[in-house]
Regions:
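Bacterial N-terminal signal peptides
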Residues: 7-16
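Extracytoplasmic "Venus flytrap"
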Residues: 23-42, 46-50, 55-69, 80, ...
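Short, solvent-exposed amphipathic alpha-helices that sit
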Residues: 35-50, 129-136, 162-181, 199, ...
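Short beta-strand elements in bilobed, periplasmic/extracellular small-molecule ligand-binding domains
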Residues: 48-61, 151-156, 172-190
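Hydrophobic alpha-helical segments within soluble ligand-binding/sensing domains
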Residues: 68, 122-149, 195-197, 244-248, ...
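Hydrophobic alpha-helical
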Residues: 76, 81-102, 171, 185, ...
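Flexible loop/hinge segments that line or gate small-molecule binding clefts
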Residues: 90-128, 132, 144-147, 151, ...
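Hinge/cleft segment of the Venus flytrap/periplasmic-binding protein
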Residues: 151, 155-159, 163, 174, ...
Length: 318
C-alpha cells in the first residue's frame, strides 16, 4: 500500500476556508495513520468531483479526544456547510456532535458517538467484522489441532471508540459459541504501537499454550506481528487483525499473521462527503450504510479485487 501523506490542517481551522466555496471538512481520529490517510483521500476525491472544498483535519492520536473536539468546534465556527467525522470516543464526542448538528449536517463515519443528531452513519459492520476475524481464527485452530479448542486472547487498541467495542463484541460472540475455546485475557491498550507490542509479548510469555490472538486494529496487528517474530511463535499462534498496511501485508505473505479483516476506508471518506453534500442540500440519507469488510488470507491476497482494496491509488491533491 503506497501511502501518500496529504497536506493536513491538523488543529486550528478557523478562518482557513475560502469565502464562497462550499466547505465540508473531513475530521478523522489520527491524521498520521495509514488507514485514515486513505479515508482522507476518499474525501478529497469526492470534493474534487463535486467542486467543493474538503479540508482534511484531525488530531495526531486517537487518544486526543479533546483535540478532536477542538477541531470540530473550529470547523463549525470557520464556516463549514456540513461535516464528516469519525468519533474518537463514543461518550466524549456525543455532546460536541449534538452541538455541531445545531448548525450544520453531520455525517459520522467509522465510529459513532453518543448522539442521535447525525444525518447518517457510514461504517463497516464492525460486529460482523469481529465475528469474521475470530471465526477464521477458530477455524484455523481447529484445522491445526483437530478441534476448536485452546486458549486465545484479544488485544484491544484502546478504550473508547465504538468500532473497537463492536469488533470485540463480535469476536466474543464467536468465542462463546465454542465450549472448548477459552478466552484467557483481553488486553486494553493506550493507542500506541509500543503498548500493543508489549501486550502481545506479555500474552505470549504468560500463556505458553496460547493458540490464537485477535487484534481489533491495525497497530495491534503490527505489535502482535513483531511479537511473534521476536519470539518465534508464528507457527504456534494463529493471529488475525483488522485493517492493513505494507507491513501487515508482508506478515500475511510470510505467514506471521493468518488473516486481515480489511475495510473500505476510501469509500467511507468518499461516501461521507457525498452524503454530507446531499444532506446540506436537503436530501434524506439512510440512517446506516454498511461499507463492507473482507477477509484477506495468504490464499486470496493476490486476487485482483483484494489487491485493489489493499493498494488504493491515492492521487488526490487537496
Amino acid at each position: 500500500m503506497k501511502i501518500k501523506y496529504l497536506l493536513l490542517a491538523i488543529a486550528f481551522v478557523l478562518g482557513s476556508f475560502s469565502a464562497n466555496a462550499v466547505k465540508i471538512p473531513v475530521i478523522v481520529k489520527d491524521s498520521t495513520s495509514p488507514f485514515w490517510q486513505i479515508v482522507l483521500d476518499g474525501g478529497c476525491t469526492a470534493g474534487a468531483e463535486l467542486g467543493i472544498e474538503v479540508p482534511l483535519l484531525g488530531p495526531t492520536s486517537e487518544a486526543d479526544i479533546a483535540g478532536q473536539i477542538n477541531v470540530l468546534e473550529d470547523a463549525v465556527a470557520g464556516g463549514a456547510d456540513a461535516i464528516v467525522i469519525a468519533a474518537t470516543s463514543f461518550e466524549g464526542l456525543g455532546a460536541p456532535i449534538d452541538e455541531a448538528a445545531k448548525s450544520v449536517p453531520v455525517v459520522v463515519i467509522d465510529s459513532i458517538a453518543d448522539s442521535k443528531n447525525h444525518a447518517s452513519f457510514m461504517t463497516t459492520n464492525n460486529v460482523e467484522g469481529g465475528r469474521m476475524g475470530c471465526q477464521h481464527m477458530v477455524d484455523l485452530i481447529a484445522e491445526k489441532h483437530g478441534a476448536p479448542e485452546g486458549e486465545v486472547a484479544i488485544v484491544n487498541y484502546g478504550a473508547g471508540p465504538s468500532s473497537l467495542r463492536d469488533r470485540i463484541q463480535g469476536c466474543n460472540e464467536v468465542l462463546d459459541s465454542y465450549p472448548g475455546i477459552e478466552l484467557v485475557a483481553t488486553k486494553v491498550g493506550d493507542f500506541t504501537t509500543t503498548r500493543q507490542l508489549n501486550d502481545s509479548l506479555d500474552l505470549i510469555t504468560t500463556f505458553p499454550n496460547l493458540r490464537g490472538i485477535f487484534d481489533d486494529a491495525l497497530f495491534g496487528g503490527l505489535g502482535t506481528g513483531q511479537a511473534l517474530k521476536e519470539t518465534g511463535k508464528a507457527d504456534d499462534i494463529i493471529a488475525v487483525t483488522f485493517d492493513s498496511s505494507d507491513e501487515l501485508i508482508n506478515y500475511i505473505n510470510d505467514g506471521t499473521l493468518k488473516g486481515l479483516i480489511i475495510q473500505d476506508p476510501w469509500g467511507m471518506g468518499n461516501m461521507g462527503v457525498k452524503g454530507a453534500f446531499d444532506a446540506m442540500n436537503g436530501k434524506a440519507l439512510p440512517a446506516f450504510t454498511d461499507t463492507g469488510a473482507t477477509l484477506v488470507t495468504a490464499d486470496n491476497i493476490k486476487n485482483a479485487d483484494i489487491d485493489a482494496k489493499l493498494n488504493p491509488s491515492l492521487d488526490c491533491k487537496p
